[in-house]
Amino acid sequence: MSTASSSSSQTPHSAPQRMRRSTAGSPPAAAGSGTGPAGSCAPAAGAGRLLQPIRATVPYQLLRGSQHSPTRPAAAATAAAALGSLSGPGGARGPSPSSPTPPPAAAPAEQAPRAKGRPRRSPESRRRSSSPERRSPGSPVCRVDRPKSQHIRTSSTIRRTSSLDTITGPYLTGQWPRDPHVHYPSCMRDKATQTPSCWAEEGAEKRSHQRSASWGSADQLKEIAKLRQQLQRSKQSSRHSKEKDRQSPLHGNHITISHTQAIGSRSVPMPLSNISVPKSSVSRVPCNVEGISPELEKVFIKENNGKEEVSKPLDIPDGRRAPLPAHYRSSSTRSIDTQTPSVQERSSSCSSHSPCVSPFCPPESQDGSPCSTEDLLYDRDKDSGSSSPLPKYASSPKPNNSYMFKREPPEGCERVKVFEEMASRQPISAPLFSCPDKNKVNFIPTGSAFCPVKLLGPLLPASDLMLKNSPNSGQSSALATLTVEQLSSRVSFTSLSDDTSTADSLEPSAQQPSQQQQLLQDLQVEEHVSTQNYVMI
């Protein structure tokens, strides 16, 4: 062991080999080494042995290394195995490797029967659990503890963090590193696909606000009660002011009276029904009213008590109270910004006691009614007496307000008159269908529909040509062939009725043109009779 200690002091880098040799040593020899300089410093810490907490100080790696030792006796191996099984519930009593106060080393004669009888502690494990600072630098156990603690730390750090190559490689390619050992509280996010976190916070705030409003906290119930009281008071004051407007014969003095009464009862109430405020900001309205109302009380009370003439110009733009004169009724002098509806029943939702005091209402929209534009259109239609649903500012080309829905051509295009061009083309194209070809037929018009024709060939082809080129273009070529066959059949029928020979029956075919004209007229007058005759034959 002296040679081992000297060699270990000379070569400090061969510490893992010394760990296996120290575990392979016999118990008396290892106990004998405790009588050296390390054993001299051990009794100094005997008083602090009972104050140490119960800790499992034998790691799994030392137990695994002790199983592979070839020269260790069986008793020490079984004791170490039993100590490993009891290390969880507190079988090993000793400080951690970094503790500065080691337990005292007992005598080797007492340690050997304890290791055999009770598997409490072995002398090597007790000596191994002591701190390396109190040991001599030449002892082999001191060389064992340092690489053991370093190995445990490096293994734990490798589990928690990934190496530098795994971080820089995907990071330079544009991908975020994903370490499987580290458990993040949320899933991995990419900046290109995720929205800002403030959006999610705003959505959560909105959701929580709606939920608290639905369940109703104490502050919100108070605000709702205040809103209801203000609405009721505004309705009552509007009713009183309307009754006074109807009863009072004056046009301007009762305005200030209603002002003073409304202010004397309470601060100027604000009608919330006329303000288009979202639901989330309704809860903020009482704070604004309470902050503005003391200043308004001072201003209006001072003006009404001192000078009534000062408050009158303030109420002139608000024209709901006094009826409009007759010359104001013309629709040409009205506009939405300057006029208000004259019918009081239609503006019943309007407030009629004070100009708008909330910061939500601009001074241009002091009429407060949500249907002011509809009232204006209604009054215009009522004044002009027209029942047309279209507004008056539409362009009407005719004096009787009948609208011609014509679309103007776009810029750079000409207006095309479609119907006039079609009407001009029709008389030109109509005679082309009824005129016969002058190259084929020569006729002399006598005023009748059927004209005498100069035959250029034999009888039957000439009559066929004449019937095809007749002015009655509605007859088809089948009808023309039908009439030719009827003519020949009539000639043959008359010849057969005379009981003449077949040679004599060919003679009536060469009769005079006067007989042919009579036959043609008979055919045209009695068409239906001729069709029946043709069917019978």
UniProtKB/Swiss-Prot annotation:
<feature type="compositionally biased region" description="Basic and acidic residues">
    <location>
        <begin position="309"/>
        <end position="321"/>
    </location>
</feature>
<feature type="modified residue" description="Phosphoserine">
    <location>
        <position position="98"/>
    </location>
</feature>
<feature type="compositionally biased region" description="Polar residues">
    <location>
        <begin position="329"/>
        <end position="346"/>
    </location>
</feature>
<feature type="modified residue" description="Phosphoserine">
    <location>
        <position position="214"/>
    </location>
</feature>
<feature type="modified residue" description="Phosphoserine">
    <location>
        <position position="402"/>
    </location>
</feature>
<feature type="modified residue" description="Phosphoserine">
    <location>
        <position position="162"/>
    </location>
</feature>
<feature type="modified residue" description="Phosphoserine">
    <location>
        <position position="396"/>
    </location>
</feature>
<feature type="coiled-coil region">
    <location>
        <begin position="217"/>
        <end position="244"/>
    </location>
</feature>
<feature type="region of interest" description="Disordered">
    <location>
        <begin position="495"/>
        <end position="520"/>
    </location>
</feature>
<dbReference type="Pfam" id="PF15388">
    <property type="entry name" value="FAM117"/>
</dbReference>
<feature type="modified residue" description="Phosphothreonine">
    <location>
        <position position="101"/>
    </location>
</feature>
<feature type="modified residue" description="Phosphoserine">
    <location>
        <position position="163"/>
    </location>
</feature>
<keyword id="KW-0597">Phosphoprotein</keyword>
<feature type="region of interest" description="Disordered">
    <location>
        <begin position="1"/>
        <end position="45"/>
    </location>
</feature>
<feature type="compositionally biased region" description="Low complexity">
    <location>
        <begin position="152"/>
        <end position="168"/>
    </location>
</feature>
<feature type="modified residue" description="Phosphoserine">
    <location>
        <position position="384"/>
    </location>
</feature>
<feature type="modified residue" description="Phosphoserine">
    <location>
        <position position="99"/>
    </location>
</feature>
<feature type="modified residue" description="Phosphoserine">
    <location>
        <position position="96"/>
    </location>
</feature>
<feature type="compositionally biased region" description="Low complexity">
    <location>
        <begin position="69"/>
        <end position="86"/>
    </location>
</feature>
<feature type="modified residue" description="Phosphothreonine">
    <location>
        <position position="340"/>
    </location>
</feature>
<feature type="compositionally biased region" description="Basic and acidic residues">
    <location>
        <begin position="178"/>
        <end position="192"/>
    </location>
</feature>
<feature type="modified residue" description="Phosphoserine">
    <location>
        <position position="248"/>
    </location>
</feature>
<feature type="modified residue" description="Phosphoserine">
    <location>
        <position position="69"/>
    </location>
</feature>
<feature type="modified residue" description="Phosphothreonine">
    <location>
        <position position="333"/>
    </location>
</feature>
<keyword id="KW-0175">Coiled coil</keyword>
<feature type="compositionally biased region" description="Low complexity">
    <location>
        <begin position="347"/>
        <end position="359"/>
    </location>
</feature>
<feature type="region of interest" description="Disordered">
    <location>
        <begin position="62"/>
        <end position="254"/>
    </location>
</feature>
<dbReference type="InterPro" id="IPR026642">
    <property type="entry name" value="Glcci1/FAM117"/>
</dbReference>
<feature type="region of interest" description="Disordered">
    <location>
        <begin position="309"/>
        <end position="407"/>
    </location>
</feature>
<feature type="modified residue" description="Phosphoserine">
    <location>
        <position position="388"/>
    </location>
</feature>
<feature type="compositionally biased region" description="Pro residues">
    <location>
        <begin position="97"/>
        <end position="106"/>
    </location>
</feature>
<protein>
    <recommendedName>
        <fullName>Glucocorticoid-induced transcript 1 protein</fullName>
    </recommendedName>
</protein>
<feature type="modified residue" description="Phosphothreonine">
    <location>
        <position position="166"/>
    </location>
</feature>
<dbReference type="GO" id="GO:0005737">
    <property type="term" value="C:cytoplasm"/>
</dbReference>
<feature type="compositionally biased region" description="Basic and acidic residues">
    <location>
        <begin position="121"/>
        <end position="136"/>
    </location>
</feature>
<feature type="modified residue" description="Phosphothreonine">
    <location>
        <position position="256"/>
    </location>
</feature>
<feature type="modified residue" description="Phosphothreonine">
    <location>
        <position position="168"/>
    </location>
</feature>
<feature type="modified residue" description="Phosphoserine">
    <location>
        <position position="293"/>
    </location>
</feature>
<feature type="modified residue" description="Phosphoserine">
    <location>
        <position position="470"/>
    </location>
</feature>
<feature type="modified residue" description="Phosphoserine">
    <location>
        <position position="335"/>
    </location>
</feature>
